[in-house]
Amino acid sequence: MTTVVKAQRRRAVIASTVGTTIEWYDFFLYGTAAALVFPTVFFPDQSAFAGVLAAFGTQFVGFAARPIGAAIFGHYGDRVGRKAMLVTTLMLMGVGTFLIGLLPSTKSIGLVAAVLLVLLRIVQGIGVGGEWGGSVLLSMEWGSARRRGFMASWPQVGVPLGLLLSTGMVKLMSGLTGDSFLTWGWRVPFLVSIVLVGIGLYVRLNVLESPDFEEVKKTRTVHRAPVLEVIKSQPLEILTSAFVRMAEQAPFYLFITFVLTYGTKQLELTRDSLLNDTLIAAAIGLVSVPFFGFLSDVIGRRLMYGIGIVCVGAFAFPYFSLLNTKNSGLVLVAIVVSLICHDMMYGPQAALIAESFGTNVRYSGAGLGYQLASVIAGGPAPLIAAAILKSTGSSTGISWYIVGCAVVSMTALLLMPRRAVSDRSAADDLMAAEPVAR
């Protein structure tokens, strides 16, 4: 039994991480294209600023769809199981991304192009909205109770890895296609995603269901309407889970998406230099995210998360000061440090939120709380930053916006109910069920 559990534990981590990597590759690819490509391809008749706002607006639509995905897949994930939902969410994201790569431009088919872009972005948003809860729970629930932070952090590694792959693909195609990048080169990274989806499906189909969920089915404690149940019984947990992400979610999309627009348009930095800096920061995240998840098992999730909140708030003004020097070395420092501060929260975040909910409503509750932050923080952030920059002509207001997000997060962290979590998991019980095979 011990050997089987260890093997499944590895498979669960790999399946969760590979899947989230592919889904975040798809999602970040859209964000990068929204900053560099879509204003020209889908909104050519707008002014430069209006085109950027319109492109970021379509990006926000995807964020708005994420709570819908969390509710739909949370319902079935708490009733049917984690594994089946993860296969479905991966297919949704993959098909949506592939079809974006086939979309004609506005010059070819008019306004219909922008409408189709929005519809496919909604499909992406629903897919990624259902993805997070299932991937985190599959990994965390196969792990030891003493290592929940570390186990739950591995699906989070899909974010820097997806960012690394998407940014790398955009940079590669930008270099290979040159002036043709805005006509057809940008499409290749979207089309390639279908191959990655095939790999992800193979991996996910070969992992067993979470032992915690199997225990829920065995004890017949599955709720008929888990989404309604968790909204009724744990509204404070949902709200604090959402608002605790303000300092992580909003600044993150400024650090990886808005910075491309700000750097190229406002500071006249090159697109390639900014993409290179993002690649370096994302590579560091492959280590820093699981490290901070592990550290949260040692010093406590709330303390680790609180340190990250303070770090992001304290770096808000130095971040733009370093960018505004236009010095390549200092710009790199700004981007790397900002994402390390983010990772201090992102590593322990999955376990922090998931542990707030019981197993029979965990997919629904954790998913809803997590994805609500996408609407109130992540989605509007580039739009708010662009509007502040347009009205003031300065980055100072954006720094204050980041500080405000940190204050909201710290307040939510202090208000977050403490839930007694068992010092054993179903996987621990399976490990103890039989002696180690000799």
Task: Show where each model-derived region lies.
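Multi-pass alpha-helical transporter architecture, strongest
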Residues: 200-207, 404-430
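C-terminal ends and interior cores of transmembrane alpha-helices
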Residues: 91-109, 310-325
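Cytoplasmic membrane-interface "Motif A"-like loop-to-helix N-cap segments
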Residues: 79-91, 298-309
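Helix-loop-helix hairpin linking two adjacent transmembrane segments in secondary transporters
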Residues: 159-204
